[in-house]
Amino acid sequence: MKKRVLAVLLSTAMVASLAIGCGSNSKSDDTKSETKTEEKADTKEETKDVESVEQRTVYVTPEWLKSAQDGNQEGYEDVVVAEVAYGDNAKDCDSYQKGHIPGAIYVGDVEVEDATGSEEGAYNLLSASEIEKNLLSHGITKDTKVVLYGGDISGTARVAYAYIWAGVEDVKIVNGGIDAWKKAGYETEKKTNEGTEAKDFGTTVPAHPEYWTSIEDAKDKVANDDNFKLVSIRSEDEWLGKTSGYNYMDKAGEPDGAVWGKGAKTAADVADFTNDDGTVKNLDGFKEVWKDCDFTLDNHLAFYCGTGWRATVPFLVLYENGYDNISVYDGGWYE
């Protein structure tokens, strides 16, 4: 459906954020050096008492991931860890080369969405066959336990959402990313890791088409379904039509019939949904943000933003809390 070509930048602000992670590679792929963030005992005994989490739990602590890697989380002995950034490969990603969670492979956002900036692509998810192919290239199937992290909260959430939509049954994100991992005193490494290609995903992709809303469905449901709420996860200035939020979008405004779900200060953040330490808020935190909004959690909530990144953060928080009356209007304001 779409080509995996990085031709048009998502936005100056967003790319600036991601460029901190991905730039020129100053290290060779075969470097074996490892660093420690702090002197801290690194034993399996230390993480044996970390509490387990449910399969649908998305946001986990660094301590939980370390416990899983230490073999102290039953069923997560072979977890696949991946750093998410915007780009085609690990060797061009500066943050990955400078140091990543041990064992982490590299996954680019361009593996799940059209990044050509074309009118047809609209930064929507790639075709089911393309996403399945990219998952299999990393050895990821529906039964793989996946833990993602990245320097951009919404970019990482975008990939997690795509994996869940595709059918990966257990997808998690290290809340706070590599900074939280380092703060916990855990090691990083610099060697490049790659998964072993898998042959069969194990189910039809997408396994959860209900989590994706098209522009046609959004228009129809806004007009004809009182329980359907098209929820804008955009800044106040975007919501009020003062700015499109993007240097490649001339028109400002919102789809007719949409309601505002707050979430952002600019097109490049989800500041309303994060704590002071950079972690994503829990459900109670989201409820506080939404207490004056024109929807309830009993509505079907189709989240959208500019191109589909910010909208995935509230989706994941509701998903991990058992809500299924949720989706992402993928095309967003751009489409």
Q: Where would I find each of the regions flagged by the language model?
A:
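Sec-dependent N-terminal signal peptides of Gram-positive bacterial secreted proteins and lipoproteins
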Residues: 2-25
